[in-house]
């Protein structure tokens, strides 16, 4: 029995020695391969070149910031932003010296290498979503970034890149936003939803001129008597060819139910007004539902928004 125990002890000791010294037993080239595998993966293609160019410009390694929701879930946005026919790149990142997310614009030089042109600091430490919009009546494209702060406050920034300069043309707090052509013009509009101190929901419609300045086209409020906040917003076309806005608002005694409001843009008054195809009260009654995740959306991709109703 004692010999068996001693044999086991010797075997365990030898095994520990082998495990502890396994690294020293590896040839130098194999050790290098192991170390390479343990490193963080490097991006390839344009993404890798953009990351390298940004790090070289910063003099340190940037931490890429990924949007947490939306259609664009990459920290890299490749698009012709200034309308010159050449592809530009926007990169979302932070560094050890910045508290908020930063936006860098890069372009290719004559040799085809990416170079940082400018960087601006954003509005918060988290990127909620990113989208591209054509808010101006030009060939340029704007970058729309939604930020979320630590207190769960939401801030929207619209960036324009023109003549080699990155400008922030809008900074505003919001709860929901939508980029759509509501007014029927040649460019898209920006619709912002927010809840006021009295509990009412404010709908703000903004359009941009050729110089990039936003003007307030319409402001509407949803009564605090019925709604306590904005859950979602969607836009689509109607059978009459007009553009409609569907707002889902929190309602009910508990504030956990949803009901919908249908609005359209009236060119004469230049306001968002209730649609006449169905009365506001009737739509409220038929769309009142107790499923908070059942929001209005274009389910079949035909450009028409479907509004859920509560079954009898």
Where are each of the predicted segments found?
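Beta-propeller-forming repeat regions
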Residues: 22-312
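Sec-dependent N-terminal signal peptides of Gram-positive bacterial secreted proteins and lipoproteins
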Residues: 6-26
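N-terminal secretory signal peptides that target proteins for export/translocation
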Residues: 1-5
């Amino acid at each position: 029995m004692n010999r068996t125990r001693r044999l086991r002890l010797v075997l365990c000791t030898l095994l520990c020695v082998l495990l502890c010294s396994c690294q020293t037993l590896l040839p130098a080239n194999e050790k290098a391969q192991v170390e390479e595998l343990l490193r963080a993966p490097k991006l390839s293609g344009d993404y890798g070149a953009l990351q390298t160019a940004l790090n070289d410009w910063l003099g340190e390694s940037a931490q890429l910031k990924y949007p947490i929701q939306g259609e664009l879930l990459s920290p890299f946005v490749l698009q012709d932003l200034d309308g010159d026919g050449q592809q530009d790149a926007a990169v979302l990142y932070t560094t050890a010296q910045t508290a908020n997310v930063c936006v860098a614009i890069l372009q290719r030089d004559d040799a085809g290498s990416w170079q940082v042109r400018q960087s601006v600091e954003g509005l918060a430490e988290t990127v909620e979503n990113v989208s591209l919009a054509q808010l101006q009546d030009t060939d340029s494209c704007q970058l729309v970034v939604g930020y979320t702060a630590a207190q769960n406050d939401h801030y929207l920034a619209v960036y324009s890149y023109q003549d080699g300069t990155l400008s922030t043309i809008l900074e505003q707090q919001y709860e929901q936003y939508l980029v759509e052509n509501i007014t029927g013009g040649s460019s898209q509009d920006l619709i912002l939803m927010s809840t006021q101190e009295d509990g009412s929901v404010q709908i703000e419609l903004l359009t941009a001129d050729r110089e990039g300045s936003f003007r307030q086209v319409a402001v509407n409020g949803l009564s605090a008597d019925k709604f306590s906040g904005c859950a979602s917003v969607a836009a689509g076309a109607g059978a009459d060819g007009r553009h409609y806005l569907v707002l889902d608002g929190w309602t009910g005694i508990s504030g956990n139910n949803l009901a919908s409001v249908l609005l359209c843009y009236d060119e004469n008054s230049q306001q968002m007004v209730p649609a006449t195809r169905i009365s506001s009260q009737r739509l409220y009654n038929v769309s009142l539902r107790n499923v908070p995740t059942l929001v209005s959306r274009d389910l079949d991709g035909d450009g028409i928004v479907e509004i859920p109703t509560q079954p009898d």
